[in-house]
Amino acid sequence: MVSFDVVAEAGEARRGQLQINDRTLETPHLFPVINFYGGGNEGALFGGGVHRTIKEFLAHDNEVTGGEDYSDLFDGVMTSISSLADYGIREKKLEWYLDNEIREWDCFSDYDGMIFADSGGYKILKQGGLEGEDFEKDIDQDKALDIQLDLGPDIVVNLDHPIHPDDEFEERIEKMEQTAVNAARFAERRDEVDGACYLTVHGYYEAMLERSFDLIEEELAEPVPEAFDGIALGSLVPRKDNVEVLVEAVSDCKREMQQRGYENLPLHVLGISGNAMPLLVAVGADTFDSASYLHQAINGKYCVNLFETVPIDDANFDACEC
């Protein structure tokens, strides 16, 4: 059972509740990106460097958390099938990881937040598939969904072909067409998903988004709101530092959704966080995901707020009320 209820509005901004089976997520919400499998074994929370530290907070490791409960920071998390091969694992270990859903491992059995399983389109398109120490796997829509479902997710999204600012017009259209074909195949397998199915669209401005939606609608056998539970706007990461472009993209996507009768679907913005989030919420975004917090931690930076970071040695932890 999937539903999205708007509980408050102010202009295009809205506060909502995303209900997926027995889990509820308050929006707006930022899904922190987590790599559940980082090359290690279960006793070490499957390793993964700084990812392991984050998982220690998620799994309530008292030695790390000092007995504090940080579960509200993990009401919903994002993971990607492409991250399974980030640490050069062997094929046997990949198969072992996928033998159990994430929550079926003892170390994650108490985790009750939502898991958003991304298709890994950007990395897969760039690398040509999943590559480990002794394997190379071509990934198409069916294989991507099979792996996503092995993770036991609450939200899945179709395998997409992100566009890039340097792409020629013909290349952008070709990628949009490939994404549309994948979306149609994804919709055909809708009944296999015990959760929410999100549709990926691409574009920085209205004409691009209009073409993206048109191509998808031409491929689908049913209206978008009958096949999908949410919209995910992609291809914005290369433009992440241009707030004006981000605002235009989200605003135009929201307008397209309204014109096509999709305004009741939640809108997720892939790979974007930071100081743009309040503005993007103001023009209609409901959820986000990002690994920026990890990159900042690796680089020794502490987020004072959405707009400012300081070196970790200069941080005043007493000023944080979280």
Predicted regions and their residues:
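Glycine-rich phosphate/ribose-binding loops and adjacent secondary-structure elements
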Residues: R23, E192-C322
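Non-catalytic, usually N-terminal nucleic-acid engagement modules in DNA/RNA processing proteins
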Residues: M1-E192
